[in-house]
Amino acid sequence: MGALLAVLAEVVELASVTGLSVESFISGEAFATAELLEAHIANLVTVGGLTEAEALAATEVPAEAYAALTSLSSTFPQAFTAVAATELATTGTLTVGATVAAALYPYYYDYSTPVANLNRGLNPEMALQLWFPEIDYEFPGLMPFVRFINYIDPTQWATNLFETIGRYSWESAQRYGQNLIAHEVRSASRELATRTAQGFSEAVARYFENARWAVSTLPRSLYSGLQSYYEQLPSLNPMQVRDLHRRLGQPIPNRIALEEQAIKSAEYVQKVDPPGGANQRIAPDWLLPLILGLYGDISPSWESTLEDIEEEEDAPQKKKRKRTKKNTPRSA
């Protein structure tokens, strides 16, 4: 451990002298910088005819930093790695050895265990007395105030009083803020849910109100319609019909125009304009209960039905009496 600390101290000292970082010394970048600087100084001395001091002044490198860089060895990172690895191996070996020795050390169950005995004047085997907190029957909060006055420090009474009042004020403000935030969140979520439900009901009611309704009897007369359809089918297929019209010199039918035939599957409900020219919202009598129900108004007929259902659900269930067999006297 001492060798590693000594090497680290030397690295920190070199970093402070040369101006380079400690990471550059450990990784080896500082040695490449030292070699480049030494080659540049030698080039200035050889080619430029300058002295070493003049070359250092020209490159703006202090003499102490240059001396420290030139004194470095290129094998410093390998040496530092070897020292760190040796230290790690030694520490790890000692730690593992101590752990294994502690795990393999025999344990005996004859160690004495200290037992608390606070009732020495009474029965040593007697249990401790139960503690009951003091209850303020007369005035809530009086006992803590009296205890605070009794324990107050005369030399620092103002500091203690200010700390107590400040803490109480802060806790009250924090509690009030939390309750206010929770109330606002609940009210905002409730308002958002109500607004969403109202918007959905409004959109559905507007859709049904402005829709084009048609009355159709197709579901009730499905089988009769199929029967009449198959009865009215011609005996010739479309190819034979076109061949027959071609022989008779009549126009050949290419397709059946359904619009030209007097076949209607439904009757549209006529939409009446608002009376009086006030452009208010109107709805037919048969559609009015549906729209009012979407807005929350229940029609009297539905209301009575719902009340009957609620009464049936809320009414107490009558207990069924168990049938018991009558004991009939046996004939002797």
UniProtKB/Swiss-Prot annotation:
Q: Where is this region: Disordered?
A: 306-332
Task: Map out region (D1) in residue numbers.
Answer: 265-300
Keywords of the record:
Capsid protein, DNA-binding, Host endoplasmic reticulum, Host membrane, Host nucleus, Late protein, Lipoprotein, Membrane, Myristate, Viral penetration into host nucleus, Virion, Virus entry into host cell
Q: Where is the composition biased (Basic residues)?
A: 318-332
Q: Name one GO molecular function term.
A: DNA binding
Among InterPro entries, the record links this protein to: Polyoma_coat_VP2
Give the CC-aspect GO terms. host cell; host cell endoplasmic reticulum membrane; host cell nucleus; membrane; viral capsid
Q: Where is the lipid attached (N-myristoyl glycine)?
A: 2
Matches recorded under Pfam families: Polyoma_coat2 (PF00761)
What domain of life is recorded for the organism?
Viruses
The record places the motif (Nuclear localization signal) at 315-323
Residue ranges of region DNA-binding? 305-332
Gene Ontology biological process terms from the UniProt entry? symbiont entry into host cell; viral penetration into host nucleus
The UniProt similarity line reads:
Belongs to the polyomaviruses capsid protein VP2 family.
Question: What is the protein name given in its UniProt record?
Answer: Minor capsid protein VP2
Give the organism the record lists.
Answer: Squirrel monkey polyomavirus
Gene name of the encoded protein: VP2
